[in-house]
Amino acid sequence: MKPLSSPLQQYWQTVVERLPEPLAEKSLSAQAKSVLTFSDFVQDSVIAHPEWLTELESQSPQADEWQHYAAWLQEALSNVSDEAGLMRELRLFRRRIMVRIAWAQTLALVTEESILQQLSHLAETLIVAARDWLYDACCREWGTPCNAQGEAQPLLILGMGKLGGGELNFSSDIDLIFAWPEHGCTQGGRRELDNAQFFTRMGQRLIKVLDQPTQDGFVYRVDMRLRPFGESGPLVLSFAALEDYYQEQGRDWERYAMVKARIMGDSEGVYANELRAMLRPFVFRRYIDFSVIQSLRNMKGMIAREVRRRGLTDNIKLGAGGIREIEFIVQVFQLIRGGREPSLQSRSLLPTLSVIAALHLLSENDAEQLRVAYLFLRRLENLLQSINDEQTQTLPSDELNRARLAWAMDFADWPQLTGALTAHMTNVRRVFNELIGDDESETQEESLSEQWRELWQDALQEDDTTPVLAHLSEDDRKQVLTLIADFRKELDKRTIGPRGRQVLDHLMPHLLSDVCAREDAAVTLSRITALLVGIVTRTTYLELLSEFPAALKHLISLCAASPMIASQLARYPLLLDELLDPNTLYQPTATDAYRDELRQYLLRVPEDDEEQQLEALRQFKQAQLLRIAAADIAGTLPVMKVSDHLTWLAEAMIDAVVQQAWVQMVARYGKPNHLNDREGRGFAVVGYGKLGGWELGYSSDLDLIFLHDCPMDAMTDGEREIDGRQFYLRLAQRIMHLFSTRTSSGILYEVDARLRPSGAAGMLVTSAEAFADYQKNEAWTWEHQALVRARVVYGDPQLTAHFDAVRREIMTLPREGKTLQTEVREMREKMRAHLGNKHRDRFDIKADEGGITDIEFITQYLVLRYAHEKPKLTRWSDNVRILELLAQNDIMEEQEAMALTRAYTTLRDELHHLALQELPGHVPEDCFTAERELVRASWQKWLVEE
C-alpha cells in the first residue's frame, strides 16, 4: 500500500483530534489511517459505530462478499415489526456495507468491476427486501392482489440506468419503474381494493421507506421519472398499460434508457420472463436501425448544452470524453444492431464493449482504450463520491480533496492525475466524434436555431439561463420557462404518436423564436400553449402550423392581440384553416354577402342531416367571427363597421335557422292553409336591443320576438293536421331549439324572447294584430322605449310593413312631456340600482352613470317625446343615426349630437376591445371622464331639468 502523501499526513492529525478516545488510543493499522484520512464519510460512520472499524480490521472486505448481502440483511430485519423499524435497519445496513465498500475501494483491495458489482447488488438487495416486507404488510392490511383466476400478483421493479446495468456509482439516485402483471382485486382483506390502488399505495410506501430522510439518513434517492408519462403518469402500471405505451408512444430516449432495464430480485419467474419478452421488441428492432445515431447525437447535444448552461466544468461524467460518451458509443451499437445480434443485448457496458470488439464494430485498439478509460473514470468518480457520500462528478478545486484523489488514484500529485485524465478523455472524445459527432461545424444561424431547440427540448428550470431569452425581464423569463415546462408535463399526459412528437419538435423552436421576440412573450405563450394542448393529438393541425410559417405568424399575432380569439381557436381548432389565407382572414365578408356565403357553405351538408346542418352553422359563424375580430385587431374595421358585420352575420344565421325549422315543421305538419293563395310564410322575427340597433358585440345575445299573421281558423295541410297558430308556436320553439342546441362547436346564440308581449308569461309567438293591440293598450313606457330599437330581421314584406306601421304609430303617439320624462328617468334609476357597477373605483361602461345606457335612454326619450311632431325620427333603430335625425330635425343641436355620437362610439369601441381581451366591461374610475361628463350634462338637460 502506498504511503500517505505529505498533505494527507498533515491532515491525519486533524482526523486524530476528531476520533473518540477508544479509537484514538487504539493502535490503528496503516490501512485504517489511510481510509480515515481519505474519506470523511468513513470517518463519520466509524465514529458513530466503532464496532464497524473493529469488524473491518478483523474481516477485511472481499470481492465476493456481495453474495452474503441478502442473508446479512435478512438477519438484520428478523426482529423488525413495523415500518419505522424497517426504515432504521435498511439505513444502518446500507451505511455499514457502504463503509466496507469504501474501505475496499480506497485501498484497491478489489477490482473496479467488483466495486461496481457490490454497489449494484447492495442496492438491489435493499430494494427487494423493502419491497417484500411491504408486500406482506400491505397484503395483511388490504388483502392479496389477484388476477381474474385468483392468482397472486407481484410487484415487479425495473432497475434502470446504472442500477440495471450492474454499474451503480458510490453515491447515486436509483431510477425505478414499477409494474404489476394483470388487473384484478385484492382477496382476504377487510375491504376489496383493485390492483391498481393496491400497488399504487404500496409503491408510495416503498418510495418513502427508501427515500425519506430520517436521523439515520436515507437508503437511496428514488427517481420515478423514467416511467411512462413521467411525473404525470401513474406510479405503477399494469403489463398491458406498459405495452400499449411503448408500442404507441415510446420515444428514442426511452429505448435508450430501456437497454439497461433489469428486473430486481427473482428475474426468472413467469411474470419476469413475460415482462422481459414484452419490452424486448421495443428496445431492439428486428432491422438495422441507423436512425439511432441522430437520436443519440441529439441527446448528446442536449447534454452538452446543459453542461454549458449550468457551467459544469471539470465534469468527468457529462463533459467531452466523459463517462456518458462511452455509454453512448456502446449503446449506439446495441440499438442499431441489437435486434439482429443477441450478443449485444447485455445490460452491462464492459461485456458489451468486448462483444463490439469481437464483432469488429470497433477496432481492438479503440475498444481497449475505451475499456481502460471507462475503468479509470469510474474509479475516479466513485472515489470522489466516497469522500463525503456525495453525488458529484465535478473534480474538486480545494487542495485537500485533490491530494486525496491523486493519492487514491496512485499518482504523485494532482497535475499527474489530470494529465492522465486528459489523455483518457481525449481518446474517448476521438472515438465518439468518429462515430456520433456532428458532421459539420454549426453556422451562426444553425447555432441560434439550436438554442431555440434547446429551449424547447431541455426542460430548463426557472433559474436556468439561456441567451435567447436574455432580452426579457427576469419575471417574464421565469414565466416563459415555467410555461414551457408545464406544457411539456401536459404533453406527457396525452397520447401522442411518434409522428406527432416529431412534428411538435420541429414546430416548437420556430414558434418559441417568434413568440419570445415579442415584449409580451409570456402572455402570448400562455394563450398559445393552451391552444396547442387541445390539438397535440391531432397531427394534421400541428403540420399545418409547422409547414405554413405564415399561418403560424398569424396565429401568434392574433393570440397576442386577443385571448378571446385564442380561446375560440383552442375550442374549435377547425378555425386554424382560416389562418392559411391572409386575404380572407383580415377581410371580412361583404355585409350584404353573408346570406349567400352561408347558403353556399350549407350546400356541402346533406339537407336532411340535422346534426351536420347545426354543426355547419356554428362553424360558419365562428369562422366569420374570427375574420371580423382579425380585421378589428388589424384596424381595418372601425367600431361601427364591426357591429354592422356582427349584425349582418346574425341576420344570416336567423335566416338559415328559420329556413331549417320551416322545412322540418312543414315536413311534419304541412303548411298553414292561409298561405295557399299568397307568397311568403306569414312569419316574422323582430330584433330588439343590440340586434335591432345594429350594435351587436362579439358575445351579444339576440333579443327576439316572433310574429305571425295566421287567422284563427287556419289549419295545416299535411297528413298530421294541426291548428295553424299551433304550427307557428312549434316553429318558434324549433327555432329556439336550433339556436340553443349545444354541439361539439357550442351553441349558435343565446336567445332572449322576454321582450314579447306580457314577457315570459306571454305566448312565445304572437299574432300581428295581438302585438299591435298590446302595444297600444297594455305596453309600459319602457316597452315603447324598447320599440325604438326594434326592427324586422326576418319576415314577409307584408308582415314587415305591418310591424313598421305599428312601430311608427306607437312611437308617434302624442305624449305628455313631463310624465314621459319622469317615467324614463325613473326606469333608468331603477336599472342603475339593479344593474349598476358593483366594483368600487371602477366605471361600468354600459350600466354606470354617464355610460352607454344613458345615451340610449336619451335618444329613446327624445324619439318618443318628439316623433309626434317629427315622424321622420322613427326611420332608424340605431342610436348613431337617431342622433343624426335629432340634429337634422332641430331637436338637438348638431354639436351636442356629434359629441354624444363620438362618446357613444368611443365607449362601444372600448367594449369591443375588452371583449377581445376577455375582460369585463368596466375600467378604472378615471377613464373616459370627458365622455362621461358630456353624457351627464346631456342627461341633466333632457331628463332632469324642467
From Swiss-Prot:
Chain segments annotated as transmembrane: none
Region named Adenylyl transferase: 449-946
Entry keywords, A to Z: ATP-binding, Magnesium, Multifunctional enzyme, Nucleotide-binding, Nucleotidyltransferase, Transferase
Cofactor(s) listed in the protein's UniProt record: Mg(2+)
GO terms for MF: [glutamate-ammonia-ligase] adenylyltransferase activity; [glutamine synthetase]-adenylyl-L-tyrosine phosphorylase activity; ATP binding; magnesium ion binding
Source organism superkingdom: Bacteria
GO cellular component terms, semicolon-separated: cytosol
Entry's EC annotation: 2.7.7.89, 2.7.7.42
Enzymatic class: transferase
Keyword flag Magnesium: yes
Stretches the record annotates as Adenylyl removase: 1-440
Task of the protein: Involved in the regulation of glutamine synthetase GlnA, a key enzyme in the process to assimilate ammonia. When cellular nitrogen levels are high, the C-terminal adenylyl transferase (AT) inactivates GlnA by covalent transfer of an adenylyl group from ATP to specific tyrosine residue of GlnA, thus reducing its activity. Conversely, when nitrogen levels are low, the N-terminal adenylyl removase (AR) activates GlnA by removing the adenylyl group by phosphorolysis, increasing its activity.
PANTHER family: BIFUNCTIONAL GLUTAMINE SYNTHETASE ADENYLYLTRANSFERASE_ADENYLYL-REMOVING ENZYME (PTHR30621:SF0), GLUTAMINE SYNTHETASE ADENYLYLTRANSFERASE (PTHR30621)
Protein name per the record: Bifunctional glutamine synthetase adenylyltransferase/adenylyl-removing enzyme
Native source species: Escherichia coli (strain SE11)
Gene that encodes it: glnE
